Amino acid sequence: MKLTCVIVAVLFLTAWTFVTADDSGNGLENLFSKAHHEMKNPKDSKLNKRCLDGGEICGILFPSCCSGWCIVLVCA
């Protein structure tokens, strides 16, 4: 009986922590809206992107920069 009460109390406090947690950045809301946008516009999805933008780290032997230039391990 005591163990059951402890388990219920722990579950309640855990749920209460998640419910009352302050999400000032609206992280989940932004995540879901972004995912919905990518479903509506598949061209905007990062999974379809095959090259790296300027300023991103690249490899010397196999550069995958959109511009085709990999200078000092950074896409130009």
From Swiss-Prot:
Q: Name one GO cellular component term.
A: extracellular region
Q: Does the keyword Lipid biosynthesis apply?
A: no
| Compartment annotation | Secreted
The record, for InterPro entries, names:
Conotoxin (IPR004214)
List the Pfam families hit by this protein, alphabetically: Conotoxin
User: What molecular function terms (GO) are annotated for this protein?
Assistant: ion channel inhibitor activity; toxin activity
Which residues pair up as cystines? C51-C66, C58-C70, C65-C75
- Chief location category: secreted
Keyword line: Cleavage on pair of basic residues, Disulfide bond, Knottin, Neurotoxin, Secreted, Signal, Toxin
Propeptide at 22-48
Entry annotated with the keyword Secreted: yes
Cleaved signal peptide residues: 1-21
Tissue pattern of expression reads: Expressed by the venom duct.
Q: What's the superkingdom here?
A: Eukaryota
UniProt record similarity statement: Belongs to the conotoxin O1 superfamily.
How does the entry describe the domains?
Answer: The presence of a 'disulfide through disulfide knot' structurally defines this protein as a knottin. The cysteine framework is VI/VII (C-C-CC-C-C).
Protein name per its UniProtKB record: Conotoxin MaIr332
* Organism whose genome encodes this protein: Conus marmoreus (Marble cone)
